Curated annotation (Swiss-Prot):
Keywords: DNA-binding, Metal-binding, Nucleus, Transcription, Transcription regulation, Virulence, Zinc
GO cellular component, one term: nucleus
Species assigned in the record: Diaporthe leptostromiformis
Gene3D superfamilies: Zn(2)-C6 fungal-type DNA-binding domain
DNA-binding region(s) from the entry: 14-41
Region Disordered, annotated ranges: 58-136, 476-499
Cellular compartment(s): Nucleus
Alphabetical list of InterPro entries matching this protein: Fun_TF, Zn2-C6_fun-type_DNA-bd_sf, Zn2Cys6_DnaBD
SUPFAM superfamilies found in the cross-reference section: Zn2/Cys6 DNA-binding domain
Task performed by this protein: Transcription factor; part of the gene cluster that mediates the biosynthesis of the phomopsins, a group of hexapeptide mycotoxins which infects lupins and causes lupinosis disease in livestock. May play a role in the regulation of the production of phomopsins.
Gene symbol of the encoding locus: phomR
Stated name of the protein: Transcription factor phomR
Entry-linked Pfam families: Fungal_trans_2, Zn_clus
GO molecular function: DNA binding; DNA-binding transcription factor activity, RNA polymerase II-specific; zinc ion binding
Length: 639
């Protein structure tokens, strides 16, 4: 390092982790602390430009620290707490826009830490500005909370279970997303579309969590911006690892869809490019135990987010590649995750369950539509079996006949039921049906298809599905198959009361079970609506759909379930005939007449897929899966 450079230096040590008395030059080998954390080491030298946030930014951070009202009581030195006082506290803020002084240099995002990701700073708009990521090989800066030494890395904090438990962060589980948004305020009078949101006001996890709930499971993942056309479930909020600007998305809400899509996707592509540079597995020996599980969790989350971006952009192959990458992590580290799950905090465990369930859901539905076998099929099977076996009790251990023992701290009982409204047993049957469809496709290609073997395998799956239908029907206040007309409309209203929430999920699973039967018959007999078994299964599916629809109206629940029901809707509606088609037309019409909260783009895609199948004659019916693949409309099925 030259003398002139040394003269400009105001502090000695590493600018990234603040490790004092570093013996290497800037651009040289990384320091031990940075190497252990797996982040890019800045070295030392003159104060980097990005270190000076300015007086306005510091004042805003100090104000938000007071607003959060959630101080931490840690046994750290008072001098360290005083040094870290100007930094944002645990209740992180997501600043979509910036004040008038920072508008020219781009927006800044501050995201709170939870002992894993840490509080990080991300800047956009400047080509030379660094990007931060919890596990990436690029620039990183920790904003230590009061009472936490700046010399400690975020993974050090995670590993220090005795000194600090992530659950001690006192996140407010009782507050709702709406209340948090109400408390948010604009950071600039001239940018009303930008808001600052206190992420600590959002529940980290809720037992009533549904796929459309805008909730931050990790402090690094900010709430999903409402009203994003067609993709409410895409994690398009301020995720530091994917470098997605929450403010940019909010600003783009008022722009035409075409213009908004281009700019938003540019941010997503930039984030995915940075994420691809991250190492696929922990490199340092310190990342063992809880650190390794947390590292895998971050990658499962990021690969899921990347797949959502890809499916939104219509790149189905890249979406499948990202899903396969996340599935490979689960496949490779399944034993470690199961064995070390007890070391994860309650919040981390539930976050892992959330992203794993969504990954399995998307992979199974995508495989069914593409007639392929998921890469991590055996892992999915074990997790789905564990969820199914523990559905009715509180047992924490269940043994599968197809694999090793699976422990529910990884995926707790009723996880699929709570997060998707569909039981794991039903999704397991869909996985089996998808594997059967892929098997037939391969046998036909090789010219060795045995109809007897095909029917025999289909009968085994059908017997399991019929058993699930009988069990689910017994849970309903009134059987959904007792109707007053052939159209499938129920003759009596359903019960009202606190059990309605469970009833909705039961009918939801029932719809999928009937659709799996229809899909099985289609695999064996082809897409022919004239097959009696297909017509009968569609009539039963109509009854379940009407019960769910009536329950939805009684509950006053918002629309938006059409993406979850997209797969069974296409299976049944595409092969419907006569009066059955009128029922599905009415279902679409009711969805289109909603209050605008539903994803109209998805509804139009469903309508287009089904009408293309109806346009052909009954003797030469078109398979809806072929329509989806040709039109590249896979995104309508994924969450």
């Amino acid at each position: 390092m030259t003398t002139s450079t040394a003269a400009k230096r105001t502090k000695s040590g590493c600018w990234t982790c603040r490790l004092r008395r570093k013996k290497c030059n800037e651009g040289g080998p990384p320091c031990d602390n940075c190497e252990a954390r797996g982040i890019h080491c800045h070295g030392y030298g003159p104060r980097p430009q990005w270190k000076d946030r300015g007086a306005l930014e510091r004042e805003e951070a100090r104000k938000l620290q007071y607003q959060s009202g959630r101080g931490r009581s840690y046994s750290r030195s008072s001098s360290t707490a005083a040094a870290a006082a100007p930094k944002p506290a645990e209740g992180a803020m997501v600043t979509g826009g910036s004040s008038s002084s920072s508008r020219g240099s781009g927006s800044s995002i501050y995201v709170g830490g939870n002992g894993l990701g840490g509080a990080q700073e991300e800047q956009h708009g400047d080509n030379n500005a660094p990007f931060s990521a919890g596990t990436g090989n690029f620039e990183y800066q920790a904003n230590p909370a009061p009472g936490i030494s700046p010399l400690m890395s975020d993974i050090d904090l995670a590993l220090d279970a005795h000194a600090m438990d992530p659950l001690d962060f006192n996140f407010d589980f009782s507050s709702t997303p709406s209340s948090a948004v109400d408390k948010s305020s604009s950071t600039s009078a001239d940018s009303p579309s930008f808001t600052s949101i206190e992420c600590s006001q959002f529940p980290i996890f809720s037992p009533e969590l549904t796929v459309d709930t805008p909730v931050a499971l990790f402090p690094q993942v900010a709430p999903i911006p409402p009203g994003l056309p067609g993709r409410e479930s895409v994690p398009v909020a301020a995720c530091t690892d994917l470098v997605i600007s929450h403010g940019l998305l909010l600003e783009e809400m008022d722009r035409p869809v075409g213009q908004r899509h281009g700019q938003v996707m540019a941010e997503g592509e930039k984030g995915i490019e940075l994420m691809m540079r991250c190492p696929p597995a922990p490199r340092a020996p310190r990342l063992e135990g809880q650190g390794r599980s947390a590292h895998i969790l971050l990658f499962v989350r990021d690969w899921y987010a990347a797949s959502s971006w890809r499916i939104w952009s219509g790149n189905i192959q890249d979406c499948q590649n990202h899903i396969d990458a996340a599935a490979s992590l689960l496949l490779e580290h399944e034993t470690a995750l199961v064995g070390e799950a007890h070391r994860l905090s309650n919040m981390e465990r539930k976050a892992l369950a959330f992203f794993t369930v969504r990954l399995i859901w998307n992979d199974v539905l995508l495989s069914s539509t593409r007639r392929t076998v998921p890469k991590a099929e055996m892992v999915y099977r074990r997790l789905l079996l564990a969820d199914s076996n523990s559905r009715g009790g509180d047992s924490h251990t269940t043994t599968s006949t197809t694999g090793p023992t699976t422990t529910t701290p990884l995926l707790a009982a009723s996880t699929f039921w709570d997060l998707t409204g569909c039981e794991g047993a039903v999704l397991l049957a869909m996985l089996d049906a998808s594997i059967l469809s892929a098997w037939r496709l391969g046998e036909e290609a090789s010219g060795s298809l045995s109809i007897r073997a095909l029917v025999g395998r289909a009968d085994k799956i059908e017997a399991v599905v019929e058993g699930e239908i009988a069990r689910l029907s017994s849970l309903l206040p009134r059987s959904p198959e007792k109707t007053s007309s052939a159209s499938g409309k129920p003759s009596h209203g359903r019960k009202t009361g606190p059990e309605n929430e469970v009833t909705v999920a039961t009918v939801h699973s029932l719809i999928f079970a009937h659709a799996i039967l229809t899909d099985l018959h289609q695999t064996v007999s082809g897409p022919r609506a004239s097959v009696p078994e297909i017509g009968d299964s569609i009539s039963r599916a109509i009854s379940s759909a009407w019960n769910l629809w009536q329950e939805q109206q009684q509950q006053g629940a918002g629309l938006g379930l059409e993406r979850i029901l997209a797969w069974p809707y296409c299976v049944a509606a595409s092969l419907a005939k006569g009066d059955q088609r009128e029922v599905f037309r009415e279902i679409i019409a009711r969805t289109e007449n909603g209050d605008g909260s539903s994803s109209g783009g998805d509804v139009q895609q469903l309508k287009s897929i089904v009408e293309q199948c109806w346009a052909t004659s009954s003797s030469n019916h078109r398979d809806w899966k072929d329509v989806v693949q040709r039109s590249n409309q896979f995104g309508v099925f994924l969450i």
